[in-house]
Amino acid sequence: MSLLAIGINHNTASVDLREKVAFGPDKLGPALEQLREHEAVNGSVIVSTCNRTEVYCDVKQGARNKLIDWLAQFHQVNQEDLMPSLYVHEEQAAIKHLMRVSCGLDSLVLGEPQILGQVKQAFSDSRDHQAVDTSIDKLFQKTFSVAKRVRTETDIGGNAVSVAYAACTLAKHIFESLSDSTVLLVGAGETIELVAKHLASNGCTKMIVANRTRERALGLGEQFGAEVISLNEIPDHLPRADIVISSTASPLPIIGKGMVETALKKRRHQPMLLVDIAVPRDVEAQVGELSDAYLYSVDDLQSIIDSNIEQRKVEAIQAEAIVSEESAAFMTWLRSLQAVDSIRDYRKSANEIREDLLSKSLQSLATGADPEKVLRELSNKLTNKLIHAPTRALQSAAEQGEPAKLTVIRQTLGLDDL
């Protein structure tokens, strides 16, 4: 029994190679089935995302090259092209790597939480294909526990490091409750969709989506229960908005100073937060001159993000310490399991010797033999049988000139305590 992790990621491989070695939905099932039947593999999990492809296995000794061969052959990739980008971790290094990955410590965005969900899904997929053995099951369950501990004891995921998340975090800081706020989202691209997801997860239920093409906006409207309007309708709905987050590809500003000024008057000068994450800008810079309008540009958010990245690096130090501690503890536990079979076999052998000699002694007593003589013979034979293997080991170590081995055997037998 040995743990092995092989893979490539955004740090080691190009997008082109990552695409070739990815396990899409059509490949994952067959791959897990092949690993389940592989002679060198006891259990496996495949983690495949846009930034990494990794195979975690409980393998028999000497399976490293066999697993690398399998990966290259499965994807029909030349091994010479794969090897420079491939990393291999064994035993505790494999445990530590999985824990680091699941905690977001090996991610493109340090501390990002999405990877944990992806690892959990990978484990679930493997279990569905009966590819998980006891060691792999215990490893991943422990990893999920460690990831939870890292999130609880550190703030590695508590600081916004994406523009979309930073925009929502800023809104949360200014408005105590997003559930009471109306948010106008200008645009309907990936960034605005991500913003909407963050807003919804923080309790925001009143969203208005304004977009040039209504079809795309309707999709977001259905997904988040948002009202849908055209860009031309923004002036009519702007007074309702406590928060405006804009990200379009418009070459010219969509929201001007006069439009916001009019909206503020209709709002009786209740404050309005405008977060412009578009380049070029969607909101005229002069809007920031209005006393009740708080305008933040993508550059303002970037400075927040840069500061938060540095804070995450500080939190990562503690997270790394937790991972080191937990991976070492798990490895110790795993090694103790490896002794279970040997202990079981040793006890079985001793019991068989005892039962055999006891049976013969009882037969002797039944025929009228002297009890004292029978007991002495039993004790002598039992002693000789039980010390036979250790005696041979001591003799072999001495004859082969292996003092270190001799010392270990003496310590094991407790001879140094005599």
From Swiss-Prot:
Subunit structure of this entry?
Homodimer.
Binding annotation for NADP(+): G187, A188, G189, E190, T191, I192
Q: What does this protein do?
A: Catalyzes the NADPH-dependent reduction of glutamyl-tRNA(Glu) to glutamate 1-semialdehyde (GSA).
- Please write the reaction equations for the catalytic activity of this protein: (S)-4-amino-5-oxopentanoate + tRNA(Glu) + NADP(+) = L-glutamyl-tRNA(Glu) + NADPH + H(+)
InterPro entries attached to this UniProt entry: 4pyrrol_synth_GluRdtase, 4pyrrol_synth_GluRdtase_dimer, 4pyrrol_synth_GluRdtase_N, GluRdtase_CS, GluRdtase_dimer_dom_sf, GluRdtase_N_sf, NAD(P)-bd_dom_sf, Shikm_DH/Glu-tRNA_Rdtase
> Per its record, how is this protein called by name?
Glutamyl-tRNA reductase
Checking PANTHER family in the record gives: GLUTAMYL-TRNA REDUCTASE
The note filed under miscellaneous reads: During catalysis, the active site Cys acts as a nucleophile attacking the alpha-carbonyl group of tRNA-bound glutamate with the formation of a thioester intermediate between enzyme and glutamate, and the concomitant release of tRNA(Glu). The thioester intermediate is finally reduced by direct hydride transfer from NADPH, to form the product GSA.
Does the record's keyword annotation contain Oxidoreductase? Answer: yes
> Its annotated pathway?
Porphyrin-containing compound metabolism; protoporphyrin-IX biosynthesis; 5-aminolevulinate from L-glutamyl-tRNA(Glu): step 1/2
Q: EC no.?
A: 1.2.1.70
Where does the signal peptide begin and end? none
- Which keywords does this Swiss-Prot/TrEMBL entry list? NADP, Oxidoreductase, Porphyrin biosynthesis
Q: What is known of its domains?
A: Possesses an unusual extended V-shaped dimeric structure with each monomer consisting of three distinct domains arranged along a curved 'spinal' alpha-helix. The N-terminal catalytic domain specifically recognizes the glutamate moiety of the substrate. The second domain is the NADPH-binding domain, and the third C-terminal domain is responsible for dimerization.
Q: Which HAMAP family match?
A: Glu_tRNA_reductase
One annotated GO biological process: protoporphyrinogen IX biosynthetic process from glutamate
Protein family according to the UniProt entry: Belongs to the glutamyl-tRNA reductase family.
Q: Which residues bind substrate?
A: T49, C50, N51, R52, S107, E112, P113, Q114, Q118
